[in-house]
Amino acid sequence: MTKTVYVLNGPNLNLLGTREPQVYGSQTLADVEQLCTAACARHGLALVFRQSNHEGALVDWIHEAGRLHAAGQLAGVVLNAAAYTHTSVALLDAVKGTGVPVVELHISNVHARESFRHHSYLAGAARAVMCGFGVQGYALAIDGLAQW
């Protein structure tokens, strides 16, 4: 049975490649999806790759991943909640409520940026937190999930 990795991207990540390239790099979200597709293929994993600017959509997708997790069909979730990392109790509750293994991911090193970005509601519920590796962090997170 092939397990699935969900890669969920939060607000403004649809602007990758044009938004603050000095912080986030020049690769687009489509480039990130290709990177994730290749990483999953290396491990024989299926990929669900999504982005939304809406918190409720991210919650719904975590619930969807939770159903796969309950059926033993989920390798894990790579969650780049973007700004919702610092504000969303709803995402925290979704992760806790479903028990999905989550890697919290940030393209930039959030700890080297503004102080409001230093706090994560999700970190305590995540299996791992990765930041500062650029978009390559997505592939590294998938590599980690494949080992669990």
Swiss-Prot record:
Q: Which residues form the active site?
A: Y24 (proton acceptor), H106 (proton donor)
Molecular function GO labels: 3-dehydroquinate dehydratase activity
* Entry-linked NCBIfam families: aroQ, PRK05395.1-2, PRK05395.1-3, PRK05395.1-4
Q: In which pathway does it act?
A: Metabolic intermediate biosynthesis; chorismate biosynthesis; chorismate from D-erythrose 4-phosphate and phosphoenolpyruvate: step 3/7
Sequence positions that bind substrate: N80, H86, D93, I107, S108, R117
Give me any GO biological process, just one.
chorismate biosynthetic process
EC number(s) on file = 4.2.1.10
Subunit composition?
Answer: Homododecamer.
Q: Which reaction does it catalyse?
A: 3-dehydroquinate = 3-dehydroshikimate + H2O
Q: What class of enzyme is it?
A: lyase
> InterPro entries, per this entry?
DHquinase_II, DHquinase_II_CS, DHquinase_II_sf
Where is the site Transition state stabilizer? R19
Question: This chain belongs to which protein, by name?
Answer: 3-dehydroquinate dehydratase
PANTHER family found in the cross-reference section: CATABOLIC 3-DEHYDROQUINASE
Family note: Belongs to the type-II 3-dehydroquinase family.
| Pfam families noted in UniProt | DHquinase_II
Reported function: Catalyzes a trans-dehydration via an enolate intermediate.
